[in-house]
């Protein structure tokens, strides 16, 4: 009887030991992969009613130009006839609502001021391949490949390169400087420093120190396996330290999507005394409003109110097809995306001064 009790205790101890061992070796790694892949499992496209055609902008010429990253990405070379180019602006778009098309009003203005523009759709967005972006570090690789492609184009070869990125795109702009320190100027709007800490922001609110001490090391390991050390183990701070480029960093204090402490505050603490760095901090522009004029912001609210009134009067529900039909008939896209002239002027002045130095 005593031997049976001992063998039962041994069995329990073995089971407990197996469970304890399986947590760090099986359960957490597998859970990390499943959750990570679920976060980056969606393909993003621009709604039809928001898509611009180059023909909507006087004199704007667009030429399709594909290149390879992990997959085939689609970009466009933008210019205006007869222009004498000062440089080429490469645009890295944000994540969640399609590719680079929504920046067309900015693209048009950059060409008006003498800059070629190369805009591309990152992996898993709009006209580019793959079912999903797959992870933040992939955006660095996409931008790295885009710059390599730009430098291989004959009319771009001798031109200085300027970067412009928002959110996910701003993260890739800062980080890609690790691979392209030759960039002359970089503008980063509402970006973040590194993938790992950004991915931990929401679970950190619930689990606290467990996220940094227990979960994020698995995220770091998985990203290193998936994307390689050259894209997963770098930060925007590292990149900015490697270059002599002029840098403009823009953020809003009330940004909830990319909290200011994940980007701007890190950069300000590190580079506030460096004359190469220029900082603009808004208080109430959220994650995206700083890109657009006050007229655009007011118009967006007005358009949404009109749409909600239409739903109420027609007795309809807010569905994709209903919104598409209404917006297609009523939206003024140029007003909806009208650039913030004050911010644009600061960007173009910085580009111009970088080219003249």
Where are these regions (language model features)?
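An N-terminal hydrophobic leader/cap segment in hydrolases
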Residues: 13-15, 20-67, 74-78, 304, ...
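The serine-hydrolase catalytic nucleophile loop
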Residues: 95-108, 122, 261
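Conserved alpha/beta-hydrolase
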Residues: 110-129
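Alpha/beta-hydrolase active-site loop
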Residues: 133-154
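Hydrolase active-site cap/lid region
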Residues: 175-229
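Short beta-strand/loop motif that positions the catalytic acidic residue
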Residues: 242-243, 249-251, 255
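Short alpha-helix in the alpha/beta-hydrolase fold that links the catalytic acid
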Residues: 245, 259-269, 294-295
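C-terminal catalytic histidine-bearing segment of alpha/beta-hydrolase fold enzymes
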Residues: 274-357
């Amino acid at each position: 009887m005593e031997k049976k009790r001992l063998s039962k205790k041994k069995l329990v101890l073995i089971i407990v030991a197996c469970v304890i061992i399986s947590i760090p070796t099986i359960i957490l790694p597998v859970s990390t992969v499943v959750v990570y892949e679920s976060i980056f499992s969606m393909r993003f496209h621009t709604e039809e009613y928001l898509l611009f055609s180059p023909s909507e902008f006087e004199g704007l010429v667009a030429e399709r130009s594909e290149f390879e990253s992990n997959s085939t990405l689609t970009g466009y070379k933008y210019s205006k006839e007869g222009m004498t180019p000062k440089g080429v602006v490469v645009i890295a778009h944000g994540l969640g609502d399609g590719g680079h098309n929504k920046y067309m009003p900015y693209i048009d203005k950059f060409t008006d001021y003498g800059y070629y523009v190369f805009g591309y759709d990152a992996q898993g967005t709009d006209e580019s391949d793959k079912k999903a972006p797959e992870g933040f570090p992939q955006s660095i690789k996409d931008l790295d490949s885009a710059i390599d492609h730009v430098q291989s184009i004959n009319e771009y070869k001798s031109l200085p390169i300027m970067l412009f990125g928002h959110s996910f795109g701003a993260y890739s702009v800062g980080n890609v400087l690790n691979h392209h320190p030759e960039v002359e100027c970089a503008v980063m709007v509402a970006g973040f420093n590194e993938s790992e800490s950004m991915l931990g922001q929401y679970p950190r609110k619930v689990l606290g120190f467990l996220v940094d001490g227990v979960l994020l090391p698995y995220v770091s390991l998985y990203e290193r396996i998936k994307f390689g050390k050259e894209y997963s183990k770098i930060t925007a701070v590292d990149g900015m330290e490697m270059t002599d480029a002029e840098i403009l960093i823009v953020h809003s204090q009330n940004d909830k999507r990319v909290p200011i402490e994940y980007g701007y505050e890190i950069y300000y603490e590190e580079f506030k005394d460096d004359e190469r760095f220029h900082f603009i901090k808004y208080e109430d522009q959220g994650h995206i409003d700083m890109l657009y004029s006050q007229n655009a912001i007011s118009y967006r609210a007005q358009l949404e109110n009109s749409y909600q009134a239409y739903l109420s009067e027609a007795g309809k529900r807010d569905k994709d097809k209903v919104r598409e039909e209404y917006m297609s008939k009523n939206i003024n896209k140029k007003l909806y995306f009208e650039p913030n002239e004050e911010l644009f002027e600061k960007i173009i002045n910085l580009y111009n001064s970088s080219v003249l130095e």
